[in-house]
């Protein structure tokens, strides 16, 4: 089997789950045509974080509707993909000596199902989620992610789901171009991706004001590092869906491999 690529997806608003024809979801459908169907998916979502590492280990994860103030239809979306206790155990083994707790009760949050619904709408590929330990710095996450490299050889698609720029307080509801600071930060990250400049990607706070405004909290940025950490020197890289929504939410997505 050819080595699987790795993917980072900008998931944006949960409402994207309901609009199959918006340009971002069209981008997701286009990108998965570029590589083989995975045997399983490991998802690192911005919406599962805490002070420790956990992995979903149930055979039939339920849906988590972790939002409020949205139409009722959004809380009726189903993505009945199976879990994979086997993959969960493999992830725990690969990440040793870090302790990873198996969670058989945890379901899929919208950072996972809202994009998987458009990447693989049949919901027939096993999915496991790995949580983010926000007690640890970005370098720790990057180094941890490197341990997941063997998954690429085993047909597992590693997907980080977040947003490079994610500032909810600065959102503008009317159609508008991105803020200058959001554009600057997004462009700096894109340049670092093109140059394989992992130092800049990990130490994004060195971008100063643009970083402080674009990443007011780290959970939406960190999933990007789980993708870039698995990049090898010969891997191709494609940036897609490279737009800003509501002025301060970047939909920038990246395929590596």
Regions found by a protein language model. Give the residues of each.
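Short glycine-enriched loops at secondary-structure junctions
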Residues: 46-50, 59-61, 108-116, 164
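A short aromatic-anchored loop/beta-hairpin motif
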Residues: 1-98
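Internal, conserved structured core segments that host functional sites
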Residues: 88-142
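Long, well-ordered alpha-helical scaffolding segments within enzyme catalytic domains
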Residues: 24-34, 139-154
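Short, glycine/serine-rich, charged loops/turns that create anion-binding
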Residues: 13, 48, 134, 163-165
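Beta-strand elements within well-structured catalytic alpha/beta cores of enzymes
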Residues: 5-9, 40-45, 130, 151-164, ...
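Surface-exposed, charge/polar-rich loops and edge strands
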Residues: 93, 97, 125-126, 136, ...
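Short, basic/glycine-rich phosphate-binding loops at helix/coil junctions
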Residues: 7-8, 66-72, 121-128, 202-203
């Amino acid at each position: 089997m050819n080595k699987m690529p790795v993917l980072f997806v900008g998931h944006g608003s949960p409402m994207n789950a309901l609009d199959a024809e918006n340009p971002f979801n069209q981008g997701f459908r286009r990108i998965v045509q570029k590589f083989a169907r995975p045997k399983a998916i490991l998802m690192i979502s911005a919406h599962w974080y805490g002070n420790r590492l956990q992995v979903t280990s149930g055979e039939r994860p339920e849906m988590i509707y972790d939002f409020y103030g949205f139409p009722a239809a959004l809380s009726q979306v189903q993505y009945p993909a199976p879990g994979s206790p086997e993959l969960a155990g493999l992830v725990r083994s690969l990440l040793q000596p870090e302790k990873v707790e198996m969670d058989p009760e945890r379901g899929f949050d919208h950072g996972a199902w809202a994009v998987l619904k458009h990447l693989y709408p049949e919901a027939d590929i096993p999915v496991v989620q790995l949580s983010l330990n926000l007690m640890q710095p970005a370098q720790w996450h990057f180094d941890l992610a490197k341990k997941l490299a063997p998954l690429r050889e085993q047909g597992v698609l590693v997907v980080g789901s977040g947003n490079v720029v994610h500032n909810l307080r600065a959102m503008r509801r009317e159609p508008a171009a991105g803020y200058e600071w959001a554009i600057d930060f997004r462009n700096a990250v894109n340049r670092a991706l093109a140059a394989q400049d992992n130092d800049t990607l990990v130490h994004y706070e060195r971008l100063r004001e643009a970083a402080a405004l674009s990443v007011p909290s780290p959970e939406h940025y960190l999933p990007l590092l789980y993708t870039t950490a698995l990049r090898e020197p010969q891997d191709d890289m494609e940036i897609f869906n490279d737009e800003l929504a509501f002025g301060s939410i970047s939909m920038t997505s990246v395929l590596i491999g």
